[in-house]
Amino acid sequence: MTRFVFITGGVVSSLGKGIASAALAALLQARGYKVRMRKLDPYLNVDPGTMSPYQHGEVFITDDGAETDLDLGHYERFTGVHASRADNTTTGRIYSDVIARERRGDYLGGTVQVIPHITDAIKDVVVTGTDDYDFVLVEIGGTVGDIESLPFLEAIRQLRNDLGHAQTMCVHLTLLPYIPAAGELKTKPTQHSVKELQNVGIQPQMLLCRSDRPIPDNERRKIANFCNVRPEAVIAALDVDTIYACPISYHNEGMDQEVLRYFDLPYDSKPDLSRWEKIVHAIREPEGEVRVAIVGKYTALLDSYKSLAEALLHGGIANHVKVKLDWIESEEFEKNGNIAERLKDADAILVPGGFGERGAEGKIQAVRYAREHNIPFLGICFGMQMAVIECARSLAGLPKASSTEFGPTDEPLVGLMTEWARGSEMLRRREGGDLGGTMRLGAYPAKLVPGSRVAEIYGRTEIRERHRHRWEVNAHYKDRLEKTGLRFSGLSPDGVLPEVVEYPDHAWFVAVQYHPELLSKPFDPHPLFAGFIAAAVKEAHRK
């Protein structure tokens, strides 16, 4: 029997529902249960693919090419279970599907309404494909009380009746603010948030209370009394120094035991949290420190690079060092010309993905600085394209080398990809067509050149990595660029699409068209990030 745990949030946003959900999933996994995680987002966009990084943060890509919420990255990093398109649904997608059915006549001329048609579609999304799992954890985005969330909350209320309360549980995350003037935690916001949830017919069975300090027993009993839950089900979600300490912290608070008790499952035994203890120890007790400069376009909102920051942390874990990140807006180099001053202390330089001409020249300057000063460099997606353009301009005698993304150019080192293969099917993008879902998205295979640095890093010559890009390095320039010393060390299986370039004579210079950060886990760091940080450690020692 599959059991469903629904996680909602109240009082304020950004309390960490995604981390809390992932931590609970990790605890259930540690007890031997098979888990699946899903996210319901109440915005009207069909997916976050066309949303600004400043609005939404990172777009996380799944193996099957779905553009999803960044919380799915947390789910994968905590559980190791690869998410799919079915695991992230928005109001926009639900409405789009229902309207498409209405146009086909699927509703036989009936009046299409939020209840039952929208709520039924939501329920189908929640339960479809879950039979093989012991637990399915479903996070509902937004905050209880938001009008956008109402159809999802109504669907949950109905599902509890459809499946039975013995098969479903509701966990509500709230804020317990501490008021210094009063010298106490205030429970009223939690009480009102639960009342808001009760008003739509949902009684939570557990409260996860975000706080910067332990909850006194008298306050715990007060919350339980006013919110109609057991005192043992009032769990303190304490602030921690690393998100990877959350499974341990929540277990110490009794969260997993209370979930199992509710479902009438054995809970006396202890879960195996040894790998989480090792990860936390490695983070808290590093043997050294390196500084990585990240020259990006969206550094004003660091959630735009959430998986990247986590992957660098994982690389630090693999090398027993603390990784200090220096976030630099690439336009700063264009405006101030202070690249040497800003990068002089960097042990490694990373240029991440992005779209558009803004800040591109600053990224090219960062590539040149890393190449000329022999500093470890990793370019990702757009970063690889800028590395190739820098090579063409500086070494191959092509000063006008550019990308067609920026406008017409005589030397299109990077061009619009209008056709590519997925399996046996050829996919095409029309000029002027919709942007949503039109990129090369998802996991694709690549072949690495035997004996290359990147093949040595991976320990194999065949890989499969996740992509999200619309422009591609022009392979017609391959021979000319390789004469300068740049090596095309990874290609698509048909040899048409460049996937990896490197400078064999450089201390460590690798650029990839894909997004390796999306596959990195704290207990299984991606080899590129482990190798990149290892090179940074060498550079730090050299200094």
Swiss-Prot record:
Protein known as: CTP synthase
Residue numbers spanned by region Amidoligase domain: 1-265
Gene Ontology molecular function, alphabetical: ATP binding; CTP synthase activity; glutaminase activity; identical protein binding; metal ion binding
Residues that bind ATP: S14, L15, G16, K17, G18, I19, D71
Ligand binding (Mg(2+)): D71, E139
Species this protein is from: Gluconobacter oxydans (strain 621H)
Family: Belongs to the CTP synthase family.
UniProt KW keywords: ATP-binding, Glutamine amidotransferase, Ligase, Magnesium, Metal-binding, Nucleotide-binding, Pyrimidine biosynthesis
Binding site for CTP: S13, D146, I147, E148, K186, T187, K188, P189, T190, Q191, K222
Residue numbers binding UTP: S13, K186, T187, K188, P189, T190, Q191, K222
Record-listed L-glutamine binding positions: Y54, G354, F382, G383, M384, Q385, E405, R470
HAMAP family: PyrG (MF_01227)
Disulfide bonds: none
Pathway it works in: Pyrimidine metabolism; CTP biosynthesis via de novo pathway; CTP from UDP: step 2/2
Activity control summary: Allosterically activated by GTP, when glutamine is the substrate; GTP has no effect on the reaction when ammonia is the substrate. The allosteric effector GTP functions by stabilizing the protein conformation that binds the tetrahedral intermediate(s) formed during glutamine hydrolysis. Inhibited by the product CTP, via allosteric rather than competitive inhibition.
EC number: 6.3.4.2
GO CC field: cytosol
Biological function: Catalyzes the ATP-dependent amination of UTP to CTP with either L-glutamine or ammonia as the source of nitrogen. Regulates intracellular CTP levels through interactions with the four ribonucleotide triphosphates.
Complex formation: Homotetramer.
Miscellaneous: CTPSs have evolved a hybrid strategy for distinguishing between UTP and CTP. The overlapping regions of the product feedback inhibitory and substrate sites recognize a common feature in both compounds, the triphosphate moiety. To differentiate isosteric substrate and product pyrimidine rings, an additional pocket far from the expected kinase/ligase catalytic site, specifically recognizes the cytosine and ribose portions of the product inhibitor.
InterPro entries for the chain: Class_I_gatase-like (IPR029062), CTP_synthase (IPR004468), CTP_synthase_N (IPR017456), GATASE (IPR017926), GATase1_CTP_Synthase (IPR033828), P-loop_NTPase (IPR027417)
PROSITE patterns noted in UniProt: GATASE_TYPE_1
Active site positions, chain numbering: C381 (nucleophile), H515, E517
Enzyme class: ligase
One Pfam entry name: CTP_synth_N
UniProt domain Glutamine amidotransferase type-1: residue ranges: 291-542
Lineage per the UniProt record: Bacteria, Pseudomonadati, Pseudomonadota, Alphaproteobacteria, Acetobacterales
